[in-house]
């Protein structure tokens, strides 16, 4: 039998049912006055809202508006007396003789071959086979039954680190095998703890940004936890709470959750985190991207501070570094791949040197070419809210179906705009960096940097909105002489990803210096630009799309 919450164990498997509900939008228009509700457009005026903060659309993610920011306000502040807490075991790693006998040169060569860099004190050596990892036989047999030949690089180094009981940071691309890197040590951890008693919450908590990822993680834990009869549940928004509540009340050793729905459950008293001694933050960068940082902080505040914490991320921006600094203790880190700031190699990067006066014409030229393909979806970044409103108004008056999203827009309007963009009803969205933190749209084909950001990290972050999930993408950047101080960093990124470089940009890099200055988010902009302003500008009669 199947419920949309996803309780599973070796004894009974209530699958992590995919439910497409929870988008929070009802059909029907706002009326003709706003210039949007053409045909079957879902209207702003009938916005229903998702009562569980699962996000807009089917991703169950970053709906970080008024309600999300208040999530967790009902949670009681925990005061921890470590001496009074029950003791628990977290040190399981015993180095295999084969690993011990390898020379330091062999270890270094193995790490170099697999682009593996480690940081921290007394980092364990990597293992090269499943048997060397030191997992109990019941875990090894499950792994070998799946037909894996040998550990992936992140597993080779990550397993000894996680089994050692230390706090761990792992930076590796999606698809690198990181789920098993924390799942198998989690199973060993659970089996070393006392059994759950009545009213106990989970022992292992995995936080993930989206319901899709949460369900994938659940499938792995179900597969490898079967022989240990480990029970798990998947807790995410957009589906009925009943089955999830039922799972939690029965007792589960593992809870995989998106932050918003987990806080719902904690505030409602449906579970607690008193027994959690192994915490995983998966795709930490994406969770922060989606606006979940306040919720993550509130959740971690409910967990005993001597827990083991493992943080996994595809990138290592300063926000993720800050989270690690705040919540991990004396952590060890493994980095798979180059540590230079680099862009996704599936993205074609086009940088054009222009004057400020040429920007609008260049943008229109690109739109005319891009929007010939009706499947195209373009995200345009500006440096300020004022510019976002100005070019949205300009585009709409020229007949382009553009909408803007920034910090001065009301949350319900931002949600509505995002849904129009996701569904392709308005395939052009203009955004500032701050507002883009809540954008999790997989099928963006193009990113256009109308204004260049204040630093290279933000550039890589912006263009990473396209080329997701194995797809190709295109990023177009309008670069002016005012941006010259960023030229050297930009050329380095373009060179690393083997892109063509405009000779004028190369010249700027030689003479214009490097290293970005300025504030994190660019200018502040003036004016509120509410729903009756740029987004309400009627589409011009010369329909361009």
Curated annotation (Swiss-Prot):
Location of this chain's protein in the cell: Cytoplasm; Nucleus
InterPro entries: DEAD/DEAH_box_helicase_dom, Helicase_ATP-bd, Helicase_C-like, P-loop_NTPase, RNA-helicase_DEAD-box_CS, RNA_helicase_DEAD_Q_motif
Cellular component terms (Gene Ontology): cytoplasm; nucleus
Chief subcellular location: cytoplasm
Domain of life the protein comes from: Eukaryota
Locus of motif Q motif: 128-156
Catalysed reaction, written as an equation: ATP + H2O = ADP + phosphate + H(+)
Domain Helicase C-terminal: 362-509
Region Disordered, residue ranges: 1-20, 50-72, 512-545
Motif DEAD box, chain ranges: 282-285
Enzyme Commission number(s) of this protein: 3.6.4.13
BP GO terms, sorted: nuclear-transcribed mRNA catabolic process, nonsense-mediated decay; rRNA processing
Protein function: ATP-dependent RNA helicase involved nonsense-mediated mRNA decay and ribosome biogenesis through rRNA processing.
Subunit architecture: Associates with polysomes.
Similarity comment: Belongs to the DEAD box helicase family. DDX5/DBP2 subfamily.
Domain notes: The Q motif is unique to and characteristic of the DEAD box family of RNA helicases and controls ATP binding and hydrolysis.
Protein name: ATP-dependent RNA helicase DBP2
UniProt source species: Coccidioides immitis (strain RS)
Lineage of source species: Eukaryota, Fungi, Dikarya, Ascomycota, Pezizomycotina
Gene that encodes the chain: DBP2
